[in-house]
Amino acid sequence: MKKLVLLQFLFFISFARGFTNVYPKPKYCPLLHEEDAGIPLFLTPLIENGKIDEARNKAVIQHKEVEAISSYAGFLTVNKKYNSNMFFWFFPALHDPKTAPVVLWLQGGPGATSMYGLFLENGPFIVTKNKTLKMREYSWNKCHNLLYIDNPVGTGFSFTEDERGYATNETHVGRDVHTALVQFFELFPELQTNDFYVTGESYGGKYVPAVSHAIKDYNIKAKIKINLKGLAIGNGLTDPVNQLDYGDYLYQLGLLDANGRNLFQKYEEQGKNLIKQEKWLEAFDLFDELLDGDITQQPSLYKNLTGFDYYFNYLHEKDPSNDSDYMVEWLQRADVRKAIHVGNRTFIPESKKVEKYMKADVMQSLAVLIADLTQHYRVLIYNGQLDIIVAYPLTENYLQKLKWPGAEKYKTAQRKVWFVGNELAGYSKTVDSLTEVLVRNAGHMVPLDQPKWALDLITRFTHNKGF
């Protein structure tokens, strides 16, 4: 009992920080400025002046470690007043790029670079412990034109020169990414009629619907209309009031006893009340101390009660790999920076400043956007079975309460078994335009844990093959 009181005391005295970026924290790796990293490539002036061929030629990446795969990279200006620029890296499909769908990947956070997706999850390359690249067998660019954007501004290589350039809500996120996408399709006009999909994971549960909704709205009057067909969200935080419900889940896993569950539920109820009162910052702080505690001097309640430092996969109490460190070290090499046209621009894999500006956004729901988008596009919501931070039952909580035209049918829809060849990959449920999938033996980052199945998952969705 004394220990329980002490935990509550520690919880209260450290109750003043944020629900921080959930990605593994890579070690600091400085850029050696004495080496020649070239200069940043800003493509917007060339695009605006109609110099498309020149822009594309300059954006080509030429480096011995990536020469086996065609790719393009550079900066797209999304706000001239604040000099806000977004970094992109684009990989044309290996098979039939003229007709292959264009897939945008957005990482979570808020403030995590999409280079995590590229190098740790679904891009054509993996950074080895020797800081060299090897090909990924199940890269999504096998049959997709694959686009990575560091989002929001201030994340990864993307940057702004004015504090007012940082996004503070999902409207800003949607606007900036849409501005970048329009320029991307001006740079690659042959792809404008290809099917387009917005995808992402984790806090991408906010970004993906925000960008999709922005495309829908801007397409009404836009000169360049984006051919959006669908959106896919992996382990996404979309509807916090109905998703942040960990006590029962951790109890069922055996990571909490009944007392721990009750303590979790006490604070979760307080958090939900704060959300309902639209006290976004207070709710943010509460749930951070419940789960993360990353930027405080005290462990989170989750850490105190379970002993876990990790919430991406309940089979691991600590991060089992150093892959994010290898990625950062590779990207900080001057020859690499010169090749990808970023020069000496600062690389921030997990931006605290982006998180600070987005803090009031975190606990707000975008379920209403998901409900609207189901009436216009196909929607895929998938979860890894072993995740904790955005676990499958928590996603199912919000989907069961989602107010959309297929809501009643969804509640009684039959679940199907999903095989990849002879392998049992997971389970799916489809009602009208909405598909929900559980991926077996995968944690928070599904393509990292189950790359073969993840490729099958996204390919079935983008090629409308069903499960």
UniProtKB/Swiss-Prot annotation:
Swiss-Prot/TrEMBL keywords: Allergen, Carboxypeptidase, Glycoprotein, Hydrolase, Protease, Secreted, Signal
Disulfide-linked positions: none
Gene3D superfamilies: alpha/beta hydrolase
Gene Ontology biological process terms, A to Z: proteolysis
Residues annotated as the enzyme's active site: S202, D387, H444
Catalytic activity line of the entry: Release of a C-terminal amino acid with broad specificity
Xref: SUPFAM superfamilies: alpha/beta-Hydrolases (SSF53474)
Annotated GO MF terms: serine-type carboxypeptidase activity
Keyword hit for Cell wall biogenesis/degradation: no
Signal peptide: 1-18
Location relative to the cell: Secreted
Similarity remark: Belongs to the peptidase S10 family.
The protein's name: Venom serine carboxypeptidase
Species whose genome carries this gene: Apis mellifera
